[in-house]
C-alpha cells in the first residue's frame, strides 16, 4: 500500500477494490479487512501495514482474537475462529425454512440471501454476538461451538444486521 494524505493531490484511485468492512482499534494498533483484502491487515503507529493473517475471500468482520482470528465466513455461512495452532471453532449461521422468507428471489445476484453473516461483537472471550440475514441477532458460544440464543426481527431476506456493539460496555 501507499500512504495517503487527503490534503495533497494524488492518492489512491476512487474505487472500492477492497470493500473494507471492518476496522478495529486496540492497544496493538489498527486492524482492518474487507471482502477482497485476502488478509487481516495491521496498521502500526509508524503507519506500516503488515499482514496479521490470511483470510478467505468474501469474509466480514475479521478481528484478532485470543492470538488467532475470528470472522464471519460469509461464503461458507459460518462464524469461524481459527487459532494459530490450527484449532478453532465453526458455528453455522442460522437459517429458516425457505418458504417462510419474504422477498426471496428478488434478485439474480444472490446478494439478498439468508445465512449471510454480517455483524460481530465480543460479549466475552468465548461468547460472541453476530448479525445475519434475514434480520437476525445470534449469541454464539465458541467453546461449545453452538448458538446459545437469538432473535429474528423480520423474515425479509433483504435485511441483514450489520453493526453490533455491547452496551453497557461489558455485561456482568
Residue ranges and their predicted role:
Residues 10-53, 58-62:
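Loop-centered beta-sheet repeat module
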Residues 10-16, 50-56, 92-97, 107-113, ...:
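Surface loop/turn motifs at the tips and blade-to-blade linkers of beta-strand repeat domains
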Residues 18-22, 57-67, 113-119, 156-169:
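Repeated scaffold domains used in trafficking and secretory/extracellular systems
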Residues 25, 32-36, 71-76, 129-134:
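Conserved beta-strand positions in repeat-built beta-propeller and related beta-rich domains
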Residues 27-29, 66-68, 125-127:
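Short coil/turn segments that connect the beta-strands within blades of beta-propeller domains
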Residues 38-41, 77-80, 136-138:
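Structural signal for beta-propeller blades
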Residues 43-47, 83-86, 142-145:
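Short loop/turn segments that connect beta-strands within beta-propeller blades
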Residues 133-172:
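Blade-level signature of beta-propeller repeat domains, shared across WD40, Kelch, NHL, RCC1
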Amino acid at each position: 500500500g501507499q500512504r495517503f494524505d487527503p490534503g495533497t493531490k494524488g492518492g489512491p484511485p476512487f474505487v472500492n477494490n477492497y470493500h473494507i468492512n471492518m476496522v478495529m482499534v486496540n492497544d496493538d494498533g489498527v486492524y482492518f479487512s474487507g471482502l477482497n483484502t485476502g488478509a487481516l491487515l495491521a496498521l502500526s503507529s509508524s503507519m506500516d501495514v503488515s499482514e496479521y493473517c490470511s483470510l478467505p475471500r468474501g469474509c466480514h468482520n475479521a478481528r484478532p482474537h485470543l492470538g488467532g482470528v475470528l470472522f464471519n465466513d460469509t461464503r461458507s455461512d459460518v462464524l469461524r475462529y481459527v487459532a494459530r495452532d490450527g484449532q478453532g471453532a465453526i458455528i453455522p449461521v442460522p437459517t429458516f425454512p425457505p418458504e417462510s422468507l419474504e422477498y426471496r428471489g428478488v434478485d439474480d445476484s444472490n446478494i439478498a440471501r439468508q445465512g449471510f453473516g454480517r455483524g460481530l461483537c465480543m460479549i466475552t472471550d468465548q461468547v460472541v454476538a453476530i448479525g445475519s440475514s434475514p434480520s437476525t441477532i445470534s449469541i454464539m458460544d465458541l467453546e461449545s461451538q453452538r448458538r446459545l440464543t437469538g432473535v429474528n426481527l423480520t423474515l425479509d431476506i433483504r435485511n441483514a444486521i450489520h453493526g453490533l456493539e455491547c452496551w453497557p460496555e461489558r455485561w456482568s
